[in-house]
């Protein structure tokens, strides 16, 4: 299917991109510019204004670009020997990159200068428009390999259903997709003592690196997963649990009812996810791959 990419599952990250455009001009034209004799006025100010406007209007010009909240646009114009260089930097905190905004700004700024100088320079040309660099997005947080990470999945449910099976399968597929070794997958009753026993077995006996539970995080009479998890945790990771709920709350008002907790027992990361398929999908999109950086921290490495 063609058209816009669906970025609704992505999280907001800091994005930046820099684009460069170069116009080739004659030495005579440079003389006119230096003496303020450009027939249509100040080319530098016009390029800065048009480039800034173009960055903010990219989605109107390029049909499949997303409307992006632009936080910063900077257009620099420098005149050298027989050339004019335009350098554009764009910044945003959003789900998708700002490369097209930077390139569009550089393009329109160069076309503006072309329009203003063409009456006096028959050999004027736009030599190049290129993306110089870009940064941002979830890929910046991916590590080279997670093949040594051992994982376990625990489904807490009084009555095993297709939904629980599907939620567990989704978690397994996600973990396998990032190279984790699935040590065990269990479905157990939503019973506090049983959950505690299994979590201890995973962390203390099997020494798995990450345990993801699904189910039992609500406010029902048989929802005990958070209580069981808290009882055996040595350190809570409040920020992760808050991030999961905040991500979900932007998609459904029911996310605030989840009581899932996240934390460490020894070097084992334990993550409570809700039981519904949609909640599991949204939560996994939210925390991976960023959560995996914790294993470097546990080894004594600093943040990037």
Residue ranges and their predicted role:
Residues 115-122, 139-190, 194-196:
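Glycine-rich phosphate/diphosphate-binding loop of Rossmann-like nucleotide-binding domains
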Residues 1-44, 49-60, 71-72, 76-150, ...:
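C-terminal binding/interaction regions
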Residues 60-66, 249:
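Active-site phosphate-binding and catalytic loops of NTP-dependent enzymes
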Residues 230-256, 294-301:
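Short, acidic/small-residue loops that bind anionic groups at enzyme active sites
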Residues 172-236:
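N-terminal small/polar loop signature for handling phosphorylated ligands or for N-terminal nucleophile
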Residues 165-167, 223-227, 284-285:
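Short amphipathic alpha-helical segments
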Residues 173, 177, 246, 289:
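Short, well-ordered alpha-helices that flank and scaffold nucleotide-derived cofactor binding pockets
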């Amino acid at each position: 299917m063609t058209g816009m990419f669906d970025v609704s599952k992505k999280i907001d990250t800091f994005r930046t991109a820099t684009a460069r455009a170069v116009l080739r001009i004659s030495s005579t034209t440079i003389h006119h510019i230096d003496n303020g004799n450009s027939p249509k006025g100040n080319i530098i100010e016009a390029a800065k204004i048009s480039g800034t406007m173009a960055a903010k209007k990219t989605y109107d010009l390029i049909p499949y670009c997303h409307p992006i909240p632009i936080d910063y646009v900077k257009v620099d114009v420098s005149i050298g020997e027989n050339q004019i260089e335009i350098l554009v930097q764009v910044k945003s905190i959003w789900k998708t990159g700002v490369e097209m905004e930077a390139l569009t700004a550089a393009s329109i700024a160069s076309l503006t200068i072309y329009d203003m100088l063409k009456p006096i320079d028959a050999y004027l040309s736009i030599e190049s428009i290129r993306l110089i660099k870009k940064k941002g997005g979830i890929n910046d947080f991916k590590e080279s390999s997670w093949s040594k990470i051992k994982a376990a999945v625990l489904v807490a449910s009084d009555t095993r259903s297709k939904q629980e099976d599907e939620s567990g399968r989704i978690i397994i597929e996600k973990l396998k997709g990032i190279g984790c070794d699935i040590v065990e997958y269990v479905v157990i009753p939503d019973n506090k003592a049983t959950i505690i026993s299994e979590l201890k077995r995973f962390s203390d006996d099997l020494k798995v690196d990450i345990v993801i539970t699904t189910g039992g995080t609500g406010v029902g009479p048989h929802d005990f997963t958070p209580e069981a998890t808290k009882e055996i945790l040595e350190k809570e990771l409040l920020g992760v649990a808050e991030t999961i709920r905040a991500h979900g709350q932007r998609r459904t008002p029911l996310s605030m009812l989840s009581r899932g907790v996240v934390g460490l027992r020894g070097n084992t990361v334990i993550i409570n996810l809700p039981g519904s398929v949609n909640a599991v999908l949204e939560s996994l999109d939210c925390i991976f791959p960023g959560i995996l950086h914790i294993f470097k921290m546990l080894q004594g490495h600093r943040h990037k």
